[in-house]
């Protein structure tokens, strides 16, 4: 079965929204990929889509989702968020936890260990949180978009349903901060180097 399938099954049981992905199970073997940069390099290769490549891209997405979950958890604990900004962080965290759980289930033993993080001051104040949240959500949207042409049709459809939620997060936190919610007419994909650097700057340390 396709990697997209078990993600859908997991989300059906964890959320009232419809499933993000369609199917169940990940077959075959895949050597562990040691660095985030190698994961993102996949997007630059533009190889023909395959189930094996879907698995590697899901591993990429897993690092993004781990980072988002850890970021929102720490900010809710330490940043003194209030009002709609706290509501945003709480709801975004719920979404990211569902994404993370579904992707982990799809990957099974191929998911790899949880990374470590050091967000520094980014999770210590509302002002720092807003800037970092925008950067993180924009990075997520651009990274998903950067992998679009490398995915099989089923997994691409699943990723599209996730990336649309990430884009809503980016718009929402901008609106709460008094910024233009959608400042650009298009969302451009980013390169492997840009994506890896973005996550490192935000706080991803090891995987």
Give the positions of each predicted feature:
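All-alpha RGS (Regulator of G-protein Signaling) helical domain and cognate RGS-like helical scaffolds
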Residues: 2-15, 22-207
């Amino acid at each position: 079965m396709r990697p997209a399938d078990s993600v859908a099954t997991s989300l059906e049981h964890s959320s009232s929204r419809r499933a993000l992905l369609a199917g169940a199970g990940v077959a075959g073997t895949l050597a562990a990929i040691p660095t985030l940069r190698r994961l993102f390099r996949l997007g630059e290769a533009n190889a023909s889509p395959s189930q094996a490549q879907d698995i590697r891209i899901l591993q990429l997405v897993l690092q993004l989702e781990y980072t988002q979950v850890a970021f929102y958890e720490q900010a809710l604990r330490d940043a003194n968020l209030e009002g709609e900004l706290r509501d945003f962080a709480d709801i975004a965290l719920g979404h990211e936890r569902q994404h993370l759980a579904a992707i982990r289930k799809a990957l099974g033993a191929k998911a790899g260990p949880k990374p470590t993080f050091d967000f520094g001051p980014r999770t210590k104040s509302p002002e720092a949180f807003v800037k970092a949240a925008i950067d993180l959500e924009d990075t997520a949207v651009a990274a998903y978009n950067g992998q679009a042409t490398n995915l099989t049709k089923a997994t691409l459809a699943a990723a599209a349903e996730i990336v649309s939620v990430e884009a809503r997060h980016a718009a929402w936190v901008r609106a709460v901060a008094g910024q233009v919610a959608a400042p650009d007419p298009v969302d451009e994909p980013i390169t492997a180097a840009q994506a890896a650097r973005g996550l490192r700057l935000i706080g991803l340390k090891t995987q």
